[in-house]
Regions:
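Short beta-strand-centered aromatic/proline hotspots
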Residues: 213-218
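Conserved, helical-rich catalytic subdomain that frames metal- and/or nucleotide-binding sites
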Residues: 160-210
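Acidic (Asp/Glu) carboxylate-rich active-site/surface patches
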Residues: 10, 85-127, 137
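Short, acidic (Asp/Glu-rich) active-site segment that either coordinates a divalent metal cofactor
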Residues: 127-157
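Structural motif
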Residues: 110-111, 208, 223
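Short beta-strand segments
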Residues: 39-41, 65, 103, 119-121, ...
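N-terminal lobe of the biotin/lipoate ligase/transferase fold
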Residues: 1-95, 162
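Single conserved hydrophobic/aromatic residue that forms the stacking wall/gate
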Residues: 221-229
Length: 229
């Protein structure tokens, strides 16, 4: 395991792990530092939402867990962490491609294809967040996907060229770090999050138990309370 600093984050780099989130879960709270990263270039059992698995070819993508210990963040506002991570990934990807959006709750899309997945687990003490373990997978240099996932895509497939992973890591963490500075400005984060929601404009096909239908998404905005400013 190697330790180094990148863009204000302390990185613990492992050659291979089953899951960076699972490794982070095993660490005692005393060893979890704010803006700490557990990174691997070979994740063998990456976890997605529910029972899903995250496919990542060895040495091709970003697989990491970012640990936050936000000061005095109320448990009721824990979604601020999700918005920080999702918007940080969106900001990074938007440097390379257009049409990047966030699909509720934690996926990042380019057009109709998924390029990044996020899995966040919180430890709560009383009314506040003790720590947040933010698992992040971003498809960077993968040339093809072998799982039955319906719509994955990588920057390599979109750009037609490989990107240097260490530089990509630095850029991604810099974007996440800038968004983390907004962690206590919930309304500001929420406004950006809603503006970049997947399919927030236009008419699309949707499906429910009655079949396929066409509709547009309507966002309902409410006036924030003074506490949310």
């Amino acid at each position: 395991m190697k330790r180094y600093e990148v863009s204000g984050f302390g990185v613990m780099e492992y050659e291979e792990v089953a899951s960076t989130n699972s490794l982070a879960e095993k660490l005692p709270l005393s060893e979890l530092k704010d803006k700490q990263v557990i990174l691997t270039w070979r994740q063998t059992q990456g976890r997605g939402q529910a029972t899903n698995r995250w496919e990542s070819a060895p040495g091709k993508n970003i697989s990491m867990t970012v640990i936050f210990r936000p000061e005095c963040l109320e448990a009721g506002k824990q979604f601020a962490v999700s918005m920080v991570i999702a918007l940080g990934c969106l900001d990074f990807l938007s440097h390379y491609v257009e049409g990047v959006t966030v699909k509720w709750p934690n996926d990042v899309y380019v057009g109709e294809r998924k390029i990044s997945g996020i899995l966040i687990e919180h430890r709560v003490a009383g009314a506040h967040i003790q720590s947040s373990l933010c698992g992040i997978g971003v498809n960077i240099n993968q040339e093809q996907f072998l799982s039955d996932a319906p719509n994955p895509v990588s920057l390599f497939q979109l750009l037609g060229r490989e990107l240097p992973l260490q530089e990509v890591l630095e850029e991604l963490l810099e974007c996440i770090g800038k968004r983390y500075e907004q962690i206590h400005r919930y309304a500001e984060l929420e406004n950006d999050f809603l503006r970049h929601m997947y399919r927030s404009t236009g008419i699309y096909d949707f499906e429910d138990e009655r079949g396929i239908f066409r509709a547009s998404v309507c966002l309902l905005y409410t006036s924030p309370s003074p506490r949310d400013q």
